[in-house]
């Protein structure tokens, strides 16, 4: 081999490459361990109405350590997404010494049961709110479907000048509504058929629906009414 210039050149090239790789790895390790390039600032982007600065600082305190190169960006993101009102967080490095976090908050659409909220994507979360919100309830995993049906039911009753204040999906998967004038409606289990029956009732009721406190729409060709005095 020592008399073969071609093999000697190949060996020399291999050794040079190996030395370069070792130097690169050494430089990377030094950069990761170096006290230089500390993260000096974390900037927060996004429209925040419910998340307090103190909550963000507490979430970041245990996660922002190391330097610009070694800081655990995924860990910072996960810590921010554990805050009650943060739906999604994106975190990136900005040279030379900054992290930038963009936060998206939940937009509460309704209360879910006694202790949770549901956002406009039909996702349940736990967060405090004093807003006057409609109330949803249903089996676990039905949040998205209840949210979607709420939008449609609300659209249907608009001509009556009322709003849907409560949507219930029972354990037997039957739909029930309460309007903001106190009227309750039983819609049955078939949600698509329920929408059709609700449309038919709205057309018939015009603005007289406030005279009734209960409407049973589970009949295929009509509906039953109960008055405030208990008469049908």
Task: Walk through the language-model features, giving the residues of each.
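Charged, solvent-exposed interaction patches on well-folded alpha/beta domains
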Residues: 1-41, 50-67, 71-82, 88-232
């Amino acid at each position: 081999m020592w008399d073969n210039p071609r093999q000697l050149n190949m060996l020399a090239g291999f050794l040079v490459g190996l030395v370069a790789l070792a130097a690169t790895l050494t430089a990377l390790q030094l950069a990761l361990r170096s006290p230089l390039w500390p993260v000096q600032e974390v900037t927060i982007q996004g429209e925040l109405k419910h998340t307090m600065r103190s909550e963000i600082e507490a979430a970041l305190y245990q996660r922002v350590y190391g330097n610009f190169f070694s800081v655990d960006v995924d860990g910072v993101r996960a810590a921010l997404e554990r805050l009650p009102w943060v739906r999604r967080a994106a975190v990136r490095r900005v040279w030379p010494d900054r992290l930038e976090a963009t936060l998206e908050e939940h937009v509460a659409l309704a209360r879910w049961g006694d202790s949770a909220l549901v956002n406009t994507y039909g996702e349940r979360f736990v967060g405090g709110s004093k807003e006057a919100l409609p109330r949803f309830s249903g089996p676990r995993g039905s949040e998205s479907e209840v949210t979607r049906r709420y939008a449609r039911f609300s659209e249907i009753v608009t001509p009556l000048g009322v709003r849907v204040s409560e949507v219930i999906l029972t354990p037997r998967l039957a739909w029930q509504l309460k309007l903001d004038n106190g009227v309750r409606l039983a819609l049955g289990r078939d949600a698509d058929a329920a929408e059709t029956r609700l449309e038919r009732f709205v057309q018939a009721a015009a603005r007289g629906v406030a005279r009734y406190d209960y409407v049973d729409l589970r009949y295929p060709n009509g509906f039953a009414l109960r008055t405030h005095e208990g008469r049908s």
